Amino acid sequence: AWGDVKARKKIVFNETMNAMNHGTASAVASTPMMSHNMSNMSMENGMHSMMSSNSSTQGQASSDLPPSMMTGMFTIDNKVFDMKRIDLTSRVGEVEEWEIQNASHMDHPFHLHGTQFEVIRKQWQGKTETASFRALKDVVNLRPNETVWIRTKQNHAGLRMYHCHILEHENLGMMGSLKVIGV
């Protein structure tokens, strides 16, 4: 009962992993969003403060990084999240089909804010499977090298986020912004 699809979107989860952190905390801390210093956090400046590139600790070594932390980036469409950028645009009331591809070696649960969606089909290891039971969701897991198609509709104008629902991946850049435009 979604109606005709009016727009199609495609996003790709990517990751660029380097060597494990063996004494390279300064390299990790100099990567955007990696120092994890939340001293400037407050309810008023929240996410903007945390993701701001002018953090006073950027480029400094962080002694609280776990020794197993990998350096690299978690991205969507080969881009690290930037609050100043709009990645996708949708229109209120339009039915959309999104193709979400996981081009990485680990699972990434996709989460879309502000609405729900139905999984239409999945493709993994050369097999395409149409969803036999469709229910409204706001998260769907993508296995390594899996593609999932969802159908959704935004009912309210405004800014939304979509991201990997593993907090560490989201914080390391695997997030995008969706601007929903009213009619």
Language-model features: where?
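Extracytoplasmic/periplasmic copper-protein system
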Residues: 1-3, 33, 173-183
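Edge beta-strand plus adjacent loop/short-helix module at the start
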Residues: 1-137, 141-149, 166
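Short loop/turn segments at connectors of secondary-structure elements within structured domains
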Residues: 104-108, 158, 172
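Short, hydrophobic beta-strand segments
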Residues: 150-155
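C-terminal functional regions that serve as terminal interaction/effector modules
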Residues: 156, 166, 170-171
